[in-house]
Amino acid sequence: MGFKKMFKKKDPTESEIRESMQDAGLLVKTDVNGYNRNKFDAYKNYAAQVTQKSSAAPPAARSNPYAVQNQQPSGGNPYAAAAAGGASGSPYGGSDPYSNGGGGNGGSNSNGGSNSNGGSNGSPYKMNNGGNNAAPPPATNSPYSMPQNGAPPKESPAKSSKFKRFGRSKKEEAPPPLEDPRLRPRQYVAPTDYNDAERDDYEPVYDVGLPEEPELPPPPMPGAVNPYASANQGYGSRFGNVDRELEEDKTALFGPRDDPPMDSSYNPALSEQPKYAESVMSMPRQELSQKVRQKEPPAAPAPQTAAVAEYSEATVAVDEEEDLLLGGGSTLNLGRVDSYSYGNEQEYGKQNYTYNYNQGHEFDTVLEEEEKTEQEQEDEDVEAVKQQIRFTKQQSAASTRNALRHAAEAEESGRNTLGMLGSQGERLYNIHSTLALATTQHKIAEDKAKELKTVTRSMFAPHVSNPFNSKRRAQEKEDRIRRERAVAQVEREQRRRDAYDSQQRVVGALDGVGEKSKHRKEMMSKYGSRPGRDRYQFEADEEDDILEDEIDNNLDELSNAAGRLKKLGLAMNEEVEQQNEKLDQIAEQTDDLDISVHLNTARLAGIH
């Protein structure tokens, strides 16, 4: 057994196989001095790292932002903080300026409510009947707690409050921090009696609890307007005095008048106006005119010219005559408010008419104020438009920034994808070269199998070559080797050309856009100059120019980024198509090689 191992032929090494193939004139794969011909190994490593992270990293556990750990027992309120946050257990710990000083131990409050169960009642709307079967309420502080069993208020240490500083004992020390009253066991304490002697050392406690009920407004006076009056009252009593409201409106519009306001309250003496109007209407025209002229004219407020005085006297006489004809009612003078100012009507028929010559000036003043108001409104509208334009420009600048950020992210993702496609193309080239080498070695194996079949024939059928065609056989062998060598060179050059084209596509797309687009040149020639852009600006101030420059630059960068993204997309499309064709060729050659290897294996199996 040892002699057999000693004389057994050893398997050739890889270098020996490569040397034998080179001696035979076959192409072999060489790696001179460790030369790395792969240009996109960095992207290959990046893809491997991404794949490893995505497959090895465990899924991130979702955290519950509403969970509060180590603060409440199971089933508690997750929003409640620890008891150290405040004496009352509030998550916003600190003094409550609206608290009534009721603590969790004593359960007292400044409103006189106290609990006999060792803690204040849990619900402000529930009263304890003092029975034995009544369940004690939870020990929580409530400023609205009700007194139980008639117990008087009882002071107890509580959290600090600016309203409670007058109710603390002089000898009382600062209370220790309280625990959560809900976690304390319930206590049942008998009601205690109130003793004045025990409270001598306490200062008076000021009631700072709930505010007292507001006092009702005093009843309306007999002459006042009652908005809740019954429907059987008069129109004027239920809806106010029309004359007074009109006078108030005119005072607000034209300013206060010099003379006292008109008293248009209800006068029982005026209830007989229709009868008086009938008596006046029955008078003859001449007698009525004489009666009006016999009345003394009212004293003029200021000296006037003769013409104005005569006109005023005649006008007043005619107006009084019309009033007498129409019945003399005070409500009939409402139409003359724009021309006359009324005096105080103490008795019927004694109106003090005075012509207001400043009415025109007041009207002009009102018009000027209205024009000024309209101008201010227009200015406000213009300012609002300016603010809207400025806000829109700021939004546009922010939108361009976001678009640039997303474009940069998309470009980075596209570059990584294209780089990984380049690395994939290099690996396809290596696969194709290795497949071509396997095909060549398979041809050598076929030749060796034929030679082995010839050598292993029977000793009674020796193999003798024909000496007459030896030269022809040698020539055919040389032609076959030359032809195989030429085909191998063509295939090798084709593979190299495909690999170079793939590499140039990827590198050209990764280098970016070298020249500015034609559209960019047109826009720069049209709107690039400042004077040309000012025509489309509302207010070309410094801030607006800065915003416009930023928007223009961002749009230029977006245009360049869009061009680069387009080039990346086209390069990826073409690269994927070429790689698909290469994969089809590799699949076809692999199938042919598999069939040839299977056939050669069958031939070797037939050799005995």
Curated annotation (Swiss-Prot):
GO terms for cellular component: plasma membrane; SNARE complex. SMART domains: t_SNARE (SM00397). Residues 100-121 have a biased composition (Gly residues). Keywords: Coiled coil, Protein transport, Repeat, Transport. PROSITE patterns: T_SNARE (PS50192). Residues 1-23, 50-307, 514-533 are annotated as: Disordered. Residues 198-215 have a biased composition (Acidic residues). Belongs to the SNAP-25 family. This is Protein transport protein SEC9. It comes from Yarrowia lipolytica (strain CLIB 122 / E 150).
